[in-house]
Amino acid sequence: MSQLSVNAIRFLGIDAIEKSKSGHPGVVMGAAPMAYDLFTKQLRINPEEPNWINRDRFVLSAGHGSMLLYALLHLSGFKDVSMEEIKNFRQWGSKTPGHPEFGHTAGVDATTGPLGQGISTATGFAQAERFLAAKYNREGYPIFDHYTYVICGDGDLMEGVSAEAASYAGLQKLDKLVVLYDSNDINLDGETKDSFTEDVRARYEAYGWHTALVEDGTDLAAIDAAINEAKASGKPSLIEVKTVIGYGSPNKQGTNAVHGAPLGAEEAEATRKALGWDYAPFEIPEEVYADYRQNVAERGAAAYDAWKQLVEDYKQAHPELAEEVAAIIAGQDPVEIKLEDFPVLENGFSQATRNSSQDALNAAAKVLPTFLGGSADLAHSNMTYIKEDGLQDDAHRLNRNIQFGVREFAMGTILNGMALHGGLRVYGGTFFVFSDYVKAAVRLSALQGLPVTYVFTHDSIAVGEDGPTHEPIEHLAGLRAIPNLTVLRPADARETQAAWYLALKSQSTPTALVLTRQNLTVEEGTDFDKVAKGAYVVYETGADFDTILLASGSEVNLAVAAAKALAAEGAKIRVVSVPSTELFDAQDAAYKEEILPNAVRRRVAIEMAASQPWYKYVGLDGAVVGIDQFGASAPAGKVLEEYGFTVEHVAEVVKNLK
């Protein structure tokens, strides 16, 4: 029976890829046995309740093998993945896109495809489970008690981000993380002997992982025994399973020819004969469905029903905690952040926005019990430390400060996993110039609709002495180009509070907070509520203005100072703070006209970054005081002067407008 069910996975993959004329059959054919054992013997999921908070998580880190996952979801009874959807693999509007997409297909726990990120995301799942278990479980009530399983390939383990995350997971002793390594000695370009020869298990043992080897990837009993041993090890686990890529294909198995292209009609037929699969394309015998129904769906439904009863009993035993757990189960924050949770700020107060961020962050931490995060070894520079808590590790699971180490990329992917898990509000910080290291994870935050907050400090050439390696130039433009990402560059402490408030209210959009090292004065015109509009008026000489200055962040202080200097000479001028171009662009036409009247063509944008994003606002008649070259090393005041960020230079640019 099991062999028939394993082959059903293989041939759903072969047939769907053949029909779409696109896909990666090799991993589906080679990894089918381990995936079958995982789903039917280990994984605790309920196809009728795909979002069950305490389900085991499964991450196909080798996302190019998506038909492996879709086949399993279909056979297990997930309604989203009907046979019609299998036939529509990689087609417009289907539930079976080329790589798995969270939120698009029920049963997909994480978007994967960019190699390495799946393992790292799974690390976040495991850390989220551990924190929530420590927070809410009580004796006899394991409300949060699940494993996170991964299937990865050689390519995943070559990627640096998987090494970052594995090092971190070993340090944290995330013992509910189990990785099955589909070790087939083949990559897209040929054999791994030409590109990847280290002893992977020895490397993972050095990270503090339990490791095991299954020499025959078709031996279901050996695979199952290895998983059980891993779960009892007390460590994160890597199980190397030796497989044959394209298993069963007489002429292509064991070669890179089967990695990323359909078998072809002739080879698909030959594989049917070789594996004894006497069924037409997309035909699955009823006994296979019965196998998956009994061993995945019914087993999972029983586990879900038992858990639901446990939650009901928990309500009686621990009513206050149960209220928070009920909110988490419903996909809500256990406590709602309110405006009054932030301190009142007076005009003229001067503080770096990174410090203002720490004040807002700590105010939120006092209210939100499941708000946690950290920094890539820069907590006391990024100001991301929750003062009332210590560092989280295996011995201190309830602490909310996470020391990610100098692992920016892994930090982002781990945060994604924690956000995907549900029940948490998470953040991570680094210097803005190093946002490039984490950008691929930020992109997946946005693609998956995850409300992760990224805290990027030291946001401009005002860093000064550290020089061009540490002075962001193109970074704002790059982040603003990512769809479904809100970039907020607040002008002062008041706008910083508002930025945090918006980030903590977000349900499906990540936020990048871009913050200063240098002090900024709270302007009289800044407004907590108006930050949500993305742009608003902070200063004007009167209703008859004929010039508009636009600025973000620290340059709002400069814009107001320049406007006042020009006003003293008789200029009629308005200053607009633009903390978020994304939020402003989302406003209706009437509001945009109110803030930037079309009739007023004399416009100057001021930002210590690449000028590119501003031309859509200033037009052909306006100007941008920006930076389209790298920075320099010198005291900050000197750098700002040399690059033209002075009242005198801004005033000169305004006077030169037509």
Protein language model features and the residues they cover:
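A short, small-residue-rich loop immediately preceding and capping a beta-strand
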Residues: S20, D56-R57, V108-T111, Y141-E159, ...
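Short, surface-exposed connector motifs at secondary-structure boundaries
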Residues: K19, N51, Y147-T148, G208-T211, ...
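Flexible, small-/acidic-enriched active-site or ligand-binding loops
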Residues: H470-I473
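Short glycine-enriched loops at secondary-structure junctions
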Residues: F89-K95, S375-S381, E388, V406-F409, ...
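Cofactor-binding active-site loop characterized by glycine-rich and histidine/acidic residues
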Residues: G30-Q172, Y385-I386, I414, M418, ...
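Thiamine diphosphate
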Residues: Q91-G103, Q127, F131-A134, G140-D145, ...
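Conserved acidic/glycine
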Residues: M1-A32, I151-C152, D156-L157, V178, ...
